[in-house]
Swiss-Prot record:
Protein's name according to its UniProt entry: DNA topoisomerase I, mitochondrial
Function: Releases the supercoiling and torsional tension of DNA introduced during duplication of mitochondrial DNA by transiently cleaving and rejoining one strand of the DNA duplex. Introduces a single-strand break via transesterification at a target site in duplex DNA. The scissile phosphodiester is attacked by the catalytic tyrosine of the enzyme, resulting in the formation of a DNA-(3'-phosphotyrosyl)-enzyme intermediate and the expulsion of a 5'-OH DNA strand. The free DNA strand then rotates around the intact phosphodiester bond on the opposing strand, thus removing DNA supercoils.
Gene Ontology biological process terms from the UniProt entry: DNA topological change
Region: Interaction with DNA, residue numbers: 254-255, 317-322, 414-416
Gene name for this UniProt entry: Top1mt
Cofactor descriptive note: Divalent metal ions (calcium or magnesium).
Main localisation: mitochondrion
Organism: Mus musculus (Mouse)
Cofactor dependence: Ca(2+); Mg(2+)
Length: 593
């Protein structure tokens, strides 16, 4: 109802047509499609690569003498290593994670490893530790940074820019390209997402001895910091990373890579979406095949077909094979267990309802009630027969066998390609249904966010409700009430002016037209505030950015903006416009994914 009211109200005023900002046109990638296709076929990614290496986090600065760590109510001077880790915890006192038992246990265990023997003898209980002064110190320091004089802020900005110029660019095949993340991640406490079993563990400081440098043989090898050396220097032109190291908590690789707005990254983005577009030509055949395989006498073939159905219709990931206990108990399609699935009896006119409940990537809970095809439901019943809750649902299937099957169906096909294809198709179809040409830009942006939300729900891109949500909604509601009062007042003034005009029989004077314009302006402002409130409420538990950046072909959004007169700035911020600069030239208003 609110959207209908907004549409009716917004028809009274129209907005100027969309234009691609001139500053963005100049940044559009000049490489043509044929050139990209040629480079995509080669395993050689570059011939020259030169850079300065990563920028390392500065050494720890000890706490001032007036800031104390207290144990059992008494000040205790810590060694530098133990004090640094204590500050990590102190900075986070205001966060909910520090109240979680897993976080506290992991932190205390890792903290004790950094203590001296004497400190370990004295500090035996986290409950007796008082980090209040440390927490207060960092709050005050943050506030001091916020209130710095303009001259000092400008000086800090210039220092950051100098650092960016020195470490934030590389030379790739004769071209200066921006680097995305040239700084190593600072040490701290691991938080993870969801209820991660390793939350609270110490993220160690990355040292040059941990880092592998990748550059061309004929380039100048970056100098490590004084007194240090690189773990290794190699020249591998089949990869696009500049430096790499292993993050010890999850034993995963971290990379220094090019900025998303760089030409090579743009080419990779384009290739990703072109592979997903190729799926459009064979997806009907693939679906017909896995539906036929639901009836196969071979258990493995039936499990493969049902798994592929889940990947296609529910955007599930395949699920990486990992050793037990290595990471959180996160699962994907192949690693689903019987305990993650519930088959519901017919109820309320609904049949073949399946409930899935498990921890997905980044420990984000996936919980969904979905109506499936009858044969899928029956196959799931067979897969679950005579199994314990902890047994694999797809016991005849492995991640590697599923991935190989996907490659056999189409070169380059992965679960991510399916997710990209279905996400982009969903956005395109939802925009077609929700967008009306006569609507205002405000209503069109609201429609776009609703289409984006449909994709986020499909991909299970959730987030916790922001802690500031209620407060910000109350503030927004007050603004709406104030604006409604202003609209009502302006309506009364306009009606009074109309009455005066009729009594005098005059033509519309300047004052009347001013009141009329004021009312229209206030109504437009009210419409925008109401749309913003609706948008915030509907998206409070949905993360729209992940799909927009990683799974939605930007040409769909740019074409929609051009077709319906929506400024691209309403959909993509400056950084995102730079990242998708390659798409501006390729997306006419008639582009179809």
């Amino acid at each position: 109802m609110l959207l209908l009211w907004l549409r009716a109200l917004c028809r009274r005023f129209q907005h100027v047509p969309c234009r691609v900002p001139s500053c963005q046109v100049s940044r559009v990638a000049k490489a043509n499609r044929a050139g990209w296709e040629e480079t995509s076929k080669s395993s050689v990614k570059w011939r020259q690569l030169e850079h300065k290496g990563p920028y390392f986090t500065p050494a720890y600065e000890p706490l001032p003498d007036g800031v104390h760590f207290l144990y059992d109510g008494k000040p205790l001077k810590l060694s530098l290593a133990a004090e640094e880790v204590a500050t990590f915890y102190g900075k986070m006192l205001h966060l909910e994670c520090t109240s979680k038992e897993v976080f506290r246990r992991n932190f205390f265990s890792d903290w004790r490893k950094e203590m001296t023997p004497e400190e370990r003898r004295l500090i035996t209980h986290l409950d007796k530790c008082d980090f209040t002064e440390i927490h207060k110190h960092f709050l005050e320091r943050a506030e001091a940074r916020r209130t710095l004089p303009r001259e000092q802020k400008q000086k800090l900005k210039e220092e950051a820019e100098k650092l960016q110029q020195e470490f934030g660019y590389c030379v790739l095949d004769g071209h200066r390209e921006k680097i995305g993340n040239f700084k190593t991640e600072p040490p701290g406490l691991f938080r993870g997402r969801g209820d991660h079993p390793k939350m609270g563990m110490l993220k160690r400081r990355v040292m040059p001895e941990d880092v592998v440098i990748n550059c061309s043989r004929d380039s100048k090898i970056p100098e490590p910091p004084a007194g240090h050396q690189w773990k290794e220097v190699r020249s591998d032109n089949t990869v696009m990373w500049l430096a790499a190291w292993v993050e010890h908590i999850q034993n995963s690789f971290k990379y220094v890579i090019l900025n998303p707005s760089s030409k090579p990254k743009g080419e990779m983005d384009w290739q990703k979406y072109e592979v997903a577009r190729r799926l459009k030509g064979v997806v009907d055949k693939i679906r017909a095949q896995y539906q036929a395989d639901w009836k196969s006498p071979e258990m493995k073939k039936r499990q493969l077909a049902v798994a592929l159905y889940f990947i296609d219709k529910l955007a599930l990931r395949t699920g990486n094979e990992k050793e037990e206990g290595e990471t959180a108990d996160t699962v994907g399609c192949c690693s689903l267990r019987v305990e993650h699935i519930r088959l519901h009896a017919p109820a309320g006119g609904q049949e073949h309802v399946v409930e899935l409940d498990f921890l997905g990537k980044d420990s984000i809970r996936y919980k969904n009630h979905v109506t499936v095809e009858k044969l899928v439901f029956q196959n799931l019943q067979h897969f679950m027969e005579d199994k314990d809750p902890r047994d694999d649902l797809f016991d005849a299937l492995t991640t590697s066998s599923l991935n190989k099957h996907l490659q056999d169906l189409m070169e380059g096909l992965t679960a991510k390609v399916f997710r990209t294809y279905n996400a982009s198709v969903t956005l395109q179809e939802q925009l077609r249904v929700l967008t009306r040409a006569e609507d205002s830009v405000t209503c069109k942006v609201l429609a776009y966010n609703r289409a984006n939300r449909a994709v986020a729900v499909l991909c299970n891109h959730q987030r916790a409700v922001p802690k500031t949500f209620e407060k910000s909604m109350q503030t927004l509601q007050k603004k709406i009430e104030t604006k409604k009062a202003q609209v009502a007042e302006a309506q009364v003034e306009l009606q009074k002016a109309e009455t005066d005009l009729r009594m005098r029989g005059d033509s519309k004077p300047k004052s009347f037209l001013q009141k009329q314009r004021r009312l229209l302006k206030l109504e437009e402002q009210l419409a925008r505030l109401c749309a913003k409130a609706t948008d915030k409420e509907e998206n409070k538990q949905v993360a729209l950015g992940t799909a927009k950046l990683n799974y939605l072909d930007p040409r769909i959004s740019i074409a929609w903006c051009k077709r319906f007169g929506v400024p691209v700035e309403k959909i993509y911020n400056k950084t995102q416009r730079e990242r998708f600069a390659w798409a501006f030239n390729q997306a006419g208003e008639d582009f179809e994914f």
